Amino acid sequence: MSSKQHCVKLNDGHLIPALGFGTYKPKEVPKSKSLEAACLALDVGYRHVDTAYAYQVEEEIGQAIQSKIKAGVVKREDLFITTKLWCTCFRPELVKPALEKSLKKLQLDYVDLYIMHYPVPMKSGDNDFPVNEQGKSLLDTVDFCDTWERLEECKDAGLVKSIGVSNFNHRQLERILNKPGLKYKPVCNQVECHLYLNQRKLLDYCESKDIVLVAYGALGTQRYKEWVDQNSPVLLNDPVLCDVAKKNKRSPALIALRYLIQRGIVPLAQSFKENEMRENLQVFGFQLSPEDMKTLDGLNKNFRYLPAEFLVDHPEYPFVEEY
């Protein structure tokens, strides 16, 4: 079953497939694995692929897309491709060149969605994670509302169909929404969201503004050592989740994804394994009862696997707010 058959409508009229394929890879995984995984994902039915400049795999994703278009597996118009503007390119004059660089790597004329990766600007230069001699991130003072105007221009230029944000709290979203001369609202806010961080208040806020919540880390992240505390709880081993899974004769991963989808959230599922990719697409084949949903609501701990501590010293660091 293709992810394209199940879609959520964005506030600009475009449709986003209700399940996406995530493409982040840790340093120790070779880039060839990203190419292989993206090809497999397109073969098994994913039509929504989420990537980012910072993941350093846009070239591989582009190769996968082109090879599957040439092979007749997919048409460009059936795909929904997202990439992200990195924090070192928030200065207004850097936005369009950054998008054009991503498009070139992806071998695409346009992306379906372009989003600001974090609300926090970093110093531009040769390094994507610039630090000072003490190892602290080199942060910048750009107002993300100025950056947003350049995203609007990229949409008008036809380089992107929809524009959105990621990792914004409700106050930061409010600033964009209340910006004088706002031309386009963000269509989405992509945030960490899963059973241990169910983002209820942020979801309510976003729904009230017709902004879709897209979830990364939907299965409790892939627990990569680079970013995630290895002593943190393993979401998919949660006994309550496992009980609900057993009752529904489904895997814990499918239950975790279904929980998000039933709340109107668009989850991103990441895997390098074909059997997991196929299984995750079965999320549309069943429903959780109101009783199960209530049980799963009870797992929320407001626990964040990915606190983005490298940005913590900036006044726009988003996770100091409750939501």
From Swiss-Prot:
Pfam families: Aldo_ket_red. CDD domains: AKR_AKR1C1-35. NAD(+) binds at residues 20-24, 50, 55, 166-167, 190, 216-224, 270-280. The record marks 84 as: Lowers pKa of active site Tyr. Keywords: NAD, NADP, Oxidoreductase. It comes from the Eukaryota. One of its GO terms (molecular function) is aldo-keto reductase (NADPH) activity. The active site is at 55 (proton donor). Its EC number is 1.1.1.-. Transmembrane segments: none annotated. Substrate binds at residue 117. GO terms for biological process: xenobiotic metabolic process. Belongs to the aldo/keto reductase family. Catalyzes the dehydrogenation of 17-beta-hydroxysteroids. May also exhibit significant activity with a variety of cyclic and alicyclic alcohols. Uses both NAD and NADP, but the activity is much greater with NAD than with NADP. This is Aldo-keto reductase family 1 member C13. It comes from Mus musculus. The lineage of its organism: Eukaryota, Metazoa, Chordata, Craniata, Vertebrata. The gene is Akr1c13.
